[in-house]
Amino acid sequence: MKSTQPRLTRRDFCFTSALAALVPAAMAGKAMAQTQAQAVEARPITGGPKHHFFGYYEKCPWDASGRLHLALEVPFIDRQPRADDAAIVGLIDTAEGNRFQPLDETLAWCWQQGTMLRWMPGAEDRLITYNKREGEDFYSVVRDVRSGQVRRLPRPLYAVSPDGKYALTLNFSRLARTRPGYGYEGGRDPWAADKRPAEDGIFRVDLATGDARLILSLDRAAGLRPKDSMKDAEHWFNHIQINTDGSRFAVLHRWRPPGARSWETRTLTAGPDGSDAFILADDGYWSHYDWLDRERILAHAAAGSIRAYHLFTDRTDRAEAIGAGVLTTDGHCSFPPDRRWVLTDTYPDKERKRTLILWRWPGGPRVDIGRFFAPPALDGPTRCDLHPRWSRDGKKVSIDSAHEGMRQIYVLDVEKIVAG
């Protein structure tokens, strides 16, 4: 969610393979940890002349077999998509020479989160879903990649429950205006002039029937323990994520005070029908996060005046500092299915390298498995974050990267590391 200054000038890629100096660290009062550098080959599964990427870090791009990997294909990477720019939705067949199989095209996509492309829970062997636009209206489709059969849903989707029964979504047009790089262009926003609409916010979509209803409005969110900075501010939601059993969700509630250069953030949680809304964090900063289980969230966020990784417990004021001295910067953090490791990354350092990190949960060694050059020309909304994603068996990692001059997808085999 952070950005750096750009200019695409060269190709560069660097792995480090020597053992790094031990970095002493206390992890929330637990045992000392260390940082190691252990090179893992980043193998491209896409190539030119077109660019390819998947999108965000909280979804698994592989099918149930681990053979097919979802991807978007685009002809450019150096500007924001316009309303008439289509991305090709497709599959990468890793058992057939990484052949890209186009399935459809979409006008509803962005650089940071793609088109919310994912395999449907419970049908990861054949069903995918993604967002589209017709005229000024966004919607989503569920596609059977075997038969080609397509079912249309009346709203775009943001997050899907673990059982595949419902989804949560928001206003992608509002998001495009308030947070470029995360929403979609070309859509209609009936509430554009309303700074905290009572009829817009988070909608729940029944994935069997397509029925959708508003469960948490922006007006209601703004009325929860309001702050002085909210007066006359424009409000929006971003980064919805449902917990591991579908019983709660988290969302970032953001607002920009009039005349302010940046926004403020707090994190809300609620039941899947919008009930029992709770302010989980209200210290102004919350970035990337993942649910550890049905109650706890790992996030790079502020707890008091400290910005660091914290483990928050839902519906409490508990926030435990995590990875002190080891996980030192914001990154796109996620857990594998067995919850034994944390996968994360960094933003570009002084050498414009992004580091890809595995960290043994909770408090074991940090292993830096790769460093990837970030082309200066790709910055702000067009930047290419690694957005690392786990395979379903927790043995591979997929990333988007432009370290070789094009935006492509790479896979790293981490089985030997995570087996330790």
Where are these regions (language model features)?
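N-terminal secretory signal peptides and thylakoid transit peptides that target proteins
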Residues: 2-21
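Surface-exposed loop and turn segments in beta-propeller and other repeat-based domains
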Residues: 45-51, 103-110, 213-231, 369-380
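Blade-loop segments of beta-propeller domains
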Residues: 56, 86-127
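Short, conserved, GDST-rich strand-edge loop motifs in beta-rich repeat architectures
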Residues: 72-85, 172-198, 253-263, 347-348
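Conserved blade-ending motifs and adjacent loop-strand segments that build the rim/top face
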Residues: 323-332, 366-387
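Loop/turn-rich, solvent-exposed surfaces of beta-rich toroidal or solenoidal domains
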Residues: 325-361
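Blade-terminus and WD-like Trp-Asp/Gly-His loop motifs, strongest in beta-propeller folds
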Residues: 60-68, 115-127, 159-166, 241-248, ...
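Asp-box/WD-like beta-propeller blade repeats and closely related beta-sheet repeat scaffolds
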Residues: 116, 131-201, 218-226
